[in-house]
C-alpha cells in the first residue's frame, strides 16, 4: 500500500485513471486483513493522493465534481465508485480533450421550497431519537450552522482580519498538509488547531498564537444555533435521555463548550472530540470509545449530516442513525451561482437556514425572503452612498415603489432627510402635458390602441371630455383612427393645460412644502424609463421655477426589448439618472436577460409594492386622489415580511462582518435572475394575483 501511494506522484493522466480502478481493488483486499484500522489509514492516504491527482489539480474538474457529489449525496454515499468514475470522465473531457467549460445553470424550484429538506417534524425527530438510551449529536451543519454556504468561506473573514490575501487557500492547504504529516508520524489524520497554525505561521509569517486566537474568536462569534435542531435537542433532554456531542474537529473542547453554551445547547453529558481522543467518526473508532464509556449493552443513536462518518460508520459500530441532510448541499442548485464569493456565500446560507431549518412558510413570503430582502437592503445602501456623494438635502421615495425602501432606509440611515412622495406615471403625464406632449399622447392614447377602449373611457382617464375634441364617445380606438386622435390632442395642448389648472395649483402647493429648504433632491423609484424623476425635474424647474437640482436612482432601467429602450439614455449618460442593478452600460447580462414581455417587470415591481391604493393624481384645493382599492394588499404584506426577515438576518451577520453591507447591484439582482430562469416558478407563485397595468389602465391577472 505504501509503495502504491508513493508512485502516484509520477503518473501521467491515463495511468491516474487506471489507479482509480486499482484503488477499489485495494479497498476490498484491505477490509479482509486483520490490521483493519492501520490499513484504513493507509487507504485514506492513497485516496487523498488520488483525489489530488484526479480532482484538485484541475479547477474545472473540481468545480463540476464537487457540484455532482453535492447534488447526488445519497448515491455518492452508497456507491462512491460512480463518483470516481465521473471524475475520470471529467478529466478526459477537460484535461485530455480540453473541452470548453460550460456554466452550470442555476435552477429554481417551482413553488414553495421551505421544509422540503428534512421530512420529519421536531416532535417526530425527537421521538425517534428517544428510542435509544444514549443520543449522540453531530455539531457543525447539524446543531450549529455557520453563516456561509461552505465552511471554508469562514477563512475569507479570518484572512481579512489577519491581513493575508488568499488566506482561504492557504488555510485549507495547511490543514491538508497537517493531516498528511500527522498520518506519517502517528498514523492518524486527527489534527489540532495548533498543528494547523504551526504551518500557517511558517508560510505566512504571522504568529501561530495570534492566528489561532483570531480563528477561535471568529468562529465562535459567527456560528449560530440551528433552530430546528435546538428544538429537537431540548425535547430529547426533556425526556431524560443521556445526550452526548460527537464531532470530528480540530478545535479544542473548551471551544465547543463555549460554542454550545452560547447557542443554547446545555445539559449534555460529554463531548467526544476526535482531535483530543486521537480517533474519529471518519474511521469509526470514536463510536467504539463511546460504547466503552457507557456500556455495550446500551442502545445508541447518532444524528448527523455526513453519510459516511455520521451514518455508515456509526451503523457499522452498532449505532442506529438519523440522517440530517446538509442544507447547503441540498439547496446548492437552487441558489444563484454568479454572486460574489463572500456575499453570495452569506446570502445562500441565510436563505437555506430560513427555508429548511424553520417552520414552513408561504411561497409569497419565500419570494420576498429569497429575492426581495437582499435587493431592498443593497438598494438602500446604494441610495445612501449616492445621497452622500451628491450632497443631497432630501431623498424623495416615490409611491408606491418606494414604500418598503423608505421604511428600511429610515431605519438604517436616520441621519438623512426623507419623504414618501405621492407621484405616479399618470399624474406626471398630466402635469407635464405641455412639456412632454409626445409622452402624454403615448401614455393615454397610443398604449391603449387595439385594446377595445372607447374614446369616452380614454378621455375620462385623462380627466377630459372627448366631445371637446369632436370625438364620438362610443367609438373604439383602433390603428385606423389613431392618427386622428393623436392630432386632436396635439392641437389642443393649451386647452388641456387649462383644464388641469386646479391640478397644477395643488401639485405646486404639495411640492413646495416637500422641497422647502432643499436644493439638491434625490428621487427613488423601482424603474424603468426614469420618467418619474425626469418629469418631476421638469415640473419643479420649468413650470414651478423652484430652481432645484433633481437626480434620480433606479433599481433597473428599460431594456433592449422595449420600444422606448433608449428613452433615458442621455440622462443615464450625464448622471441625472443612476442605475443600481442594470442598464445598457451596467451588468449587461442582466440587461439582456430581463424581458418585460415575460412579466419580469411585474414580478420585480411586486418586490417594491405598497399596501395602499395607487395614487391617481391631484385634485382641487390640495386634494390627493387615490384608486378605490388596493390590489394584492395581503400579498404585498407577505412579501415585505419576508424581505424584512432577511434584512434582519443579514444585518445580524453584517454586525460582525461590516464590509458585507456594501452589496453590489449584480449581487442584489442575482436571486431574482435565478427566480426568472424557471418560467414556471413565479407564474405559479402569483397565479391568483393581479397587477395594475398602467399602460392599459386596467387591473390585469398576472
Please provide the spans of the model-predicted regions.
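Conserved phosphoryl-transfer catalytic core
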Residues: 150-185, 333-338, 441-459
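Short, acidic loop-to-helix structural element flanking the phosphoryl-transfer center
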Residues: 118, 186-245
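Acidic, divalent-metal-coordinating active-site segment for phosphoryl/phosphodiester hydrolysis
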Residues: 306-321
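Short glycine-rich phosphate-binding loop at a beta-alpha junction
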Residues: 136, 248, 392-399, 521-524
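Long, contiguous domain-sized segments
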Residues: 364, 372, 379, 430-431, ...
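Asp-based phosphoryl-transfer active-site loop
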Residues: 128-148
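Conserved Lys-Pro-Asp/Glu-containing loop-to-beta segment of HAD-superfamily phosphomonoesterases
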Residues: 282-308
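Substrate-recognition/cap helix-loop segment adjacent to the acidic, metal-dependent catalytic center
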Residues: 237-244, 249-275, 414
Amino acid at each position: 500500500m505504501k509503495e502504491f501511494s508513493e508512485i502516484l506522484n509520477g503518473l501521467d493522466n491515463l495511468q491516474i485513471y487506471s489507479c482509480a480502478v486499482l484503488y477499489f481493488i485495494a479497498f476490498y483486499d484491505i477490509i479482509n486483513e486483520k490490521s483493519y484500522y492501520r490499513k484504513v489509514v493507509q487507504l485514506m492516504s492513497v485516496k487523498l493522493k488520488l483525489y489530488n491527482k484526479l480532482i484538485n489539480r484541475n479547477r474545472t474538474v473540481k468545480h463540476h465534481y464537487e457540484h455532482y457529489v453535492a447534488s447526488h449525496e445519497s448515491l455518492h454515499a452508497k456507491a462512491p465508485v460512480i463518483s470516481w468514475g465521473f471524475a475520470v470522465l471529467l478529466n478526459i473531457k477537460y484535461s485530455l480533450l480540453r473541452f470548453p467549460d460550460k456554466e452550470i445553470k442555476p435552477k429554481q424550484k417551482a413553488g414553495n421550497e421551505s421544509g422540503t429538506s428534512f421530512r420529519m417534524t421536531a416532535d417526530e425527530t425527537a421521538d425517534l431519537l428517544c428510542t435509544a438510551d444514549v443520543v449522540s449529536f453531530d455539531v457543525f451543519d447539524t446543531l450549529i450552522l455557520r453563516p456561509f454556504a461552505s465552511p471554508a468561506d469562514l477563512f475569507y473573514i479570518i484572512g481579512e482580519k489577519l491581513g493575508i490575501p488568499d488566506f482561504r487557500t492557504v488555510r485549507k492547504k495547511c490543514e491538508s498538509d497537517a493531516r498528511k504529516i500527522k498520518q506519517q508520524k502517528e498514523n492518524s489524520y486527527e489534527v489540532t488547531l495548533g498543528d494547523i497554525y504551526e504551518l500557517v505561521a511558517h508560510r505566512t509569517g504571522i504568529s501561530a498564537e495570534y492566528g489561532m486566537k483570531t480563528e477561535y474568536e471568529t468562529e465562535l462569534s459567527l456560528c449560530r444555533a440551528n433552530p430546528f435542531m435546538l428544538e429537537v435537542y431540548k425535547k430529547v433532554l426533556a425526556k431524560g435521555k443521556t445526550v452526548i456531542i460527537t464531532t470530528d474537529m480540530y478545535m479544542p473542547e473548551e471551544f465547543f463548550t463555549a460554542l454550545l453554551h452560547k447557542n443554547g445547547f446545555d445539559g449534555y453529558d460529554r463531548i467526544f472530540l476526535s482531535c483530543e481522543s486521537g480517533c474519529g467518526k471518519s474511521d469509526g473508532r470514536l463510536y467504539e470509545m463511546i460504547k466503552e464509556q457507557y456500556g455495550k449493552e446500551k442502545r445508541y443513536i447518532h444524528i448527523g449530516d455526513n453519510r459516511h462518518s455520521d451514518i455508515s460508520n456509526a451503523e457499522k459500530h452498532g449505532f442506529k442513525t438519523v440522517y440530517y441532510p446538509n442544507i447547503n448541499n441540498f439547496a446548492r442548485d437552487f441558489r444563484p451561482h454568479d454572486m460574489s464569493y463572500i456575499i453570495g456565500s452569506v446570502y445562500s446560507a441565510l436563505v437555506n437556514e430560513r427555508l429548511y431549518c424553520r417552520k414552513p412558510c408561504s411561497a409569497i413570503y419565500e419570494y420576498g425572503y429569497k429575492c426581495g430582502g437582499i435587493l431592498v437592503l443593497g438598494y438602500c445602501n446604494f441610495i445612501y452612498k449616492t445621497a452622500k456623494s451628491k450632497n443631497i438635502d432630501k431623498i424623495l421615495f416615490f409611491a408606491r415603489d418606494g414604500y418598503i425602501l423608505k421604511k428600511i432606509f429610515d431605519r438604517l440611515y436616520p441621519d438623512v432627510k426623507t419623504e414618501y412622495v405621492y407621484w405616479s406615471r399618470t399624474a406626471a403625464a398630466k402635469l407635464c402635458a405641455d412639456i412632454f406632449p409626445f409622452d402624454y399622447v403615448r401614455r393615454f392614447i397610443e398604449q391603449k390602441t387595439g385594446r377595445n377602449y372607447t374614446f369616452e373611457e380614454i378621455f375620462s382617464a385623462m380627466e377630459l371630455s372627448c366631445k371637446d375634441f369632436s370625438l364620438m364617445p362610443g367609438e373604439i380606438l383602433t390603428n385606423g383612427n389613431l392618427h386622428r386622435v393623436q392630432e386632436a390632442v396635439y392641437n389642443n395642448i393649451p386647452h388641456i393645460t387649462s383644464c388641469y389648472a386646479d391640478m397644477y395649483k395643488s401639485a405646486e402647493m404639495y411640492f413646495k412644502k416637500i422641497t422647502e429648504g432643499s436644493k439638491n433632491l434625490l428621487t427613488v423609484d423601482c424603474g424603468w424609463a426614469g420618467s418619474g424623476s425626469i418629469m418631476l425635474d421638469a415640473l419643479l424647474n420649468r413650470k414651478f421655477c423652484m430652481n432645484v437640482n433633481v437626480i434620480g436612482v433606479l433599481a433597473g432601467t428599460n431594456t433592449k426589448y422595449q420600444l422606448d429602450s433608449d428613452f433615458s439614455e442621455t440622462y443615464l449618460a450625464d448622471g441625472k439618472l443612476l442605475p443600481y442593478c442594470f442598464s445598457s452600460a451596467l451588468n449587461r447580462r442582466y440587461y439582456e436577460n430581463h424581458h418585460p414581455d415575460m412579466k419580469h417587470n411585474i414580478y420585480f415591481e411586486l418586490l417594491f409594492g405598497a399596501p395602499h391604493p395607487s395614487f391617481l393624481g391631484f385634485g382641487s384645493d390640495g386634494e390627493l386622489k387615490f384608486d378605490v382599492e388596493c390590489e394584492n394588499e395581503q400579498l404585498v404584506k407577505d412579501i415585505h415580511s419576508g424581505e424584512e426577515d432577511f434584512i434582519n438576518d443579514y444585518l445580524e451577520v453584517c454586525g460582525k462582518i461590516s464590509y458585507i453591507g456594501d452589496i453590489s447591484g449584480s449581487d442584489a439582482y442575482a436571486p431574482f435572475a435565478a427566480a426568472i430562469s424557471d418560467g414556471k416558478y413565479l407564474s405559479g407563485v402569483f397565479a391568483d394575483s393581479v397587477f395594475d397595468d398602467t399602460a392599459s389602465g386596467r387591473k390585469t391577472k398576472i
